[in-house]
């Protein structure tokens, strides 16, 4: 059984290194440029703030230091392996497809999550009906983060390297990828279906969409022995 660990930062492949730099630069810019976060975050398509570019830009926006730190660690750990295994062009296309696909799934899921939220909120609100709450939810909805694309990366990693052992804080023992990453998927599935905390400000369906799209792509590539995707 292999024990998984990454080498030094100097060994980073070019696409992963570029994405790390871009995400950090954008994160700093978010605190310096008024309106940048709203411009780049994904709004629902009936909102006056929705723009098509947000399907891409949302994956380079983050909501806080912990958010970007975790995502960049995932990109470094798993993305570096996949880029080295596939090559830069193939990894770039894979990452962007997973990210854009996650954005589309997010938009498709908004009516469902809005109804979930309205069911809970209408019980505590005064003067607002469920339909009004749903419409306000849609107009105010905004999603951001690289997590959708990265769930696709993690799903591909688990498929290609299922027995690789991962050390995940705070667990004291290594866990194989084929167990750990499906566990994260189930957390998002339960969260997306409202089994647990509703309105937890996590785009669970973006994560699920990215993971499913990533898994489908890597299965197709593996079965057809495709060496390129560009």
Language model features with spans:
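A detector for small-residue-rich transmembrane helices and their helix-helix packing motifs
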Residues: 1-230
């Amino acid at each position: 059984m292999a024990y998984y660990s990454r080498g030094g930062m100097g060994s980073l492949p070019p696409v992963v290194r570029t994405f790390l730099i871009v995400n950090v630069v954008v994160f700093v810019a978010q605190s310096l440029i008024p309106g940048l976060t709203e411009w780049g975050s994904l709004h629902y398509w009936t909102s006056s703030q929705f723009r098509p570019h947000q399907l891409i830009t949302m994956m380079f926006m983050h909501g806080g230091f912990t958010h970007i730190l975790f995502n960049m660690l995932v990109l470094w750990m798993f993305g570096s392996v996949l880029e080295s295994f596939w090559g830069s062009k193939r990894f770039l296309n894979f990452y962007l497809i997973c990210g854009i696909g996650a954005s589309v799934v997010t938009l498709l899921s908004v009516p469902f999550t809005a109804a979930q939220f309205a069911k809970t909120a209408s019980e505590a609100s005064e003067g607002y009906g469920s339909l009004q709450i749903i419409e306000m939810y849609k107009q105010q909805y905004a999603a951001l983060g690289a997590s959708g694309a990265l769930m696709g990366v993690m799903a591909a990693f688990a498929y290609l390297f299922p027995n690789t052992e991962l050390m995940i804080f705070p667990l004291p023992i290594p866990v194989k990828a084929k167990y750990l990453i499906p566990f994260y998927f189930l957390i998002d599935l339960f969260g997306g279906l409202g089994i647990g905390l509703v309105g937890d400000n996590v785009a669970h369906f973006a994560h699920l969409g990215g993971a499913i799209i990533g898994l489908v792509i890597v299965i197709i590539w593996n079965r057809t022995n495709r060496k390129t995707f560009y």
